[in-house]
């Protein structure tokens, strides 16, 4: 049975209690700049990097060498232009020792409507992937997708080029051999995730879809691994981790979120044990 640990407090302090190299995957969506003022106080864009660096330093310490850190974040428009705090944060984290391995896009299929004089509404958010080393655990087959109807037509009549490796004309070293995919019904996904926002807790300000952490948990962990969300909010990441038989740690500064997550994650029919120690809860 997966174990869920709920820690109440500021993650800057709570992360210090976790052992070195003890976490396999970190998936989180911290407060964006000037956002969640009623729940987390809001962090000004100019102060965001300085605010997050102590947190990312602790995350670097507790992540296993083979582990992955997924950071959901987005820019904020200030005085008519996008602030650069996200780009500055990436550079600062690289200076800390992180490898910025990949950037994925969360396409929000049901984003909020709106109109601005110099831009369109945001329909995407960044999913930044950081690692401690170039070789890390990654199970790509776990997130493969159905090839769909396109394969029935595209792969029906193959050209000569399709039957040999199609080397890039620009000499990039990338190429493809379409013939290899004729008998396959699965394909590797792109780095764009098309997911609608959702939130079972309407009082929580971050609409984090369950499918998002699920995708990364399947991709980067196996049952029994440890998943961490240092800004757990309503506990979406923890719910998914438990369903997928991964141990999970959730941290939040608000007691209300801790209590709600505890009430949801504890199954009275199975008489799960609850341990309370100085405001810290362990659900096993």
Regions found by a protein language model. Name each.
Residues 1-260, 268, 276, 283-284:
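Core catalytic lobe of class I
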């Amino acid at each position: 049975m997966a174990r869920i640990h709920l820690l109440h407090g500021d993650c800057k302090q709570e992360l210090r209690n976790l052992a070195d190299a003890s976490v396999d995957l970190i998936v989180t969506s911290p407060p964006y700049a000037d956002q969640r003022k009623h729940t987390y106080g809001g962090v000004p864009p100019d102060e965001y990097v300085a605010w997050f660096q102590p947190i990312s330093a602790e995350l670097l310490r507790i992540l296993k060498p083979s582990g992955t850190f997924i950071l959901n974040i987005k820019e904020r428009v200030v005085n008519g232009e996008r602030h650069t705090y996200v780009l500055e944060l990436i550079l600062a984290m690289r200076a800390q020792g992180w490898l910025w391995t990949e950037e994925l896009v969360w396409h929000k299929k049901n984003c909020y409507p709106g109109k601005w004089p110099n831009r369109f509404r945001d329909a995407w958010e960044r999913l930044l992937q950081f690692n401690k080393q170039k070789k890390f655990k990654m199970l790509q087959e776990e997130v493969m997708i159905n090839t769909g109807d396109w394969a029935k037509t595209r792969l029906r009549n193959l050209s000569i080029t399709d039957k040999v490796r199609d080397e890039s004309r620009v000499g990039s070293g990338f190429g493809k051999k379409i013939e290899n995919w004729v008998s396959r019904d699965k394909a590797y996904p792109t780095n764009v995730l098309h997911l609608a926002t959702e939130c079972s807790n309407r009082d929580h300000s971050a609409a984090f879809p369950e499918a998002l952490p699920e995708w990364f948990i399947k991709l980067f962990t196996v049952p029994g691994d440890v998943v961490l969300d240092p800004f757990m909010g309503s506990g979406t990441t923890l719910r998914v981790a438990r369903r997928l038989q991964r141990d999970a740690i959730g941290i939040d500064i608000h007691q209300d979120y801790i209590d709600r997550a505890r009430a949801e994650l504890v199954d009275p029919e199975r008489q799960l044990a609850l341990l309370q120690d100085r405001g810290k809860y362990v659900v096993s």
